[in-house]
């Protein structure tokens, strides 16, 4: 059978550009069909309501993944309201500010995956232009991938796919991704590689704190510009750390790779020149 997945992208976090791609990395998987609706960079209640209702009422997938910043904000709360009442299993993927609402999401009958290392961007006009935005998100994606956070998200969604295929009740994940959960998913062979990935994760968490200070808590331009700039420098070095971790794994031919088979099964390999099984 073919499982129909609906993905709602409202606003943007680092995981947003790759949440659908990580399910079908070579575009040759024949057991899923993905439909994506979004509201661009905005995530106001009106924009979110429009795309969420269209997903529930018109596309009607087997399950829905909503992804965006701060699940506790007004726009995402509107999405949660619609998805909770929609009769379609749904999971909310968000960043650390959503942790305070995780119990409420569970009470609404929704799953959640909250990524602590997916930080807020330094959204000050005097600093952030399209190039800086793209470079920041590229660094965040590298951290998500290299620490294992991306793999945790992918596994959670794949578990939902497999349940549909097997005719079972869809498991709604209830996951807060910490550095321990992330690195466990990466199956590091070298303990130093694991330590570097953990350090990168914690650095990315700190980036969010710095950007909150620069964007919301500091009013003077001469103070907040260097604050948000320092946050972006921090994520750049976190991305370098995950590169170092992967290079350590490459040096002993021990990089964990888990590609999807054409039928959707998750395969496994570590040696570069071996076939995944």
Curated annotation (Swiss-Prot):
UniProt pathway: One-carbon metabolism; methanogenesis from CO(2); 5,10-methylene-5,6,7,8-tetrahydromethanopterin from 5,10-methenyl-5,6,7,8-tetrahydromethanopterin (coenzyme F420 route): step 1/1
Entry-linked SUPFAM superfamilies: F420-dependent methylenetetrahydromethanopterin dehydrogenase (MTD) (SSF102324)
Signal peptide: none
Reaction(s) the record says it catalyses: 5,10-methylenetetrahydromethanopterin + oxidized coenzyme F420-(gamma-L-Glu)(n) + 2 H(+) = 5,10-methenyl-5,6,7,8-tetrahydromethanopterin + reduced coenzyme F420-(gamma-L-Glu)(n)
Organism superkingdom: Archaea
Function as written in the Swiss-Prot or TrEMBL entry: Catalyzes the reversible reduction of methenyl-H(4)MPT(+) to methylene-H(4)MPT.
Protein name: F420-dependent methylenetetrahydromethanopterin dehydrogenase
